[in-house]
């Protein structure tokens, strides 16, 4: 058996070994599932514990490819502090909160949660992951809107981190 397979264009591609997903891949998957769960909570007002159970039991959802602890933290943290999270970004919006698309709202709540509560997640990662969620699940241009709002929020809640990054960039460009 060969160690090299060919791709559709007949160029050799390294044979894939059963490689475990990286921590960032697991967290990205957790965010995708948390988005779906938060959206369900927003739309149906189903108890969070019931939603979590549905996600764990449902074989169609790939819970094995995510960080279950992080999924649970996002779901529980976002839903428990939704009103507080909304106040963080509401004044940055160009329209009332009630007029936001439900997917955009769920994405912004997750992004706001990570920016304000998960200081171990770099602000650029929190914003980028939210933008990717908006691209994958939101309306055509929603990712641009999400990016703008969360970037402004990061300027407020991660001021020191942003300043340190800018200073480090200045030093490396000398």
Curated annotation (Swiss-Prot):
UniProt keyword RNA-binding, yes or no: yes
Keyword Transcription regulation annotated: yes
One record GO biological process: DNA-templated transcription termination
Pfam families membership: NusB
Biased composition annotated in UniProt, kind: Polar residues: 1-11
GO molecular function, one term: RNA binding
One GO location term (cellular component): cytosol
Xref: InterPro entries: NusB-like_sf (IPR035926), NusB_fam (IPR011605), NusB_RsmB_TIM44 (IPR006027)
Top-rank taxon: Bacteria
Keywords in alphabetical order: RNA-binding, Transcription, Transcription antitermination, Transcription regulation
Residues covered by region (Disordered): 1-29
Family stated for the protein in its record: Belongs to the NusB family.
Primary role: Involved in transcription antitermination. Required for transcription of ribosomal RNA (rRNA) genes. Binds specifically to the boxA antiterminator sequence of the ribosomal RNA (rrn) operons.
Name of this protein: Transcription antitermination protein NusB
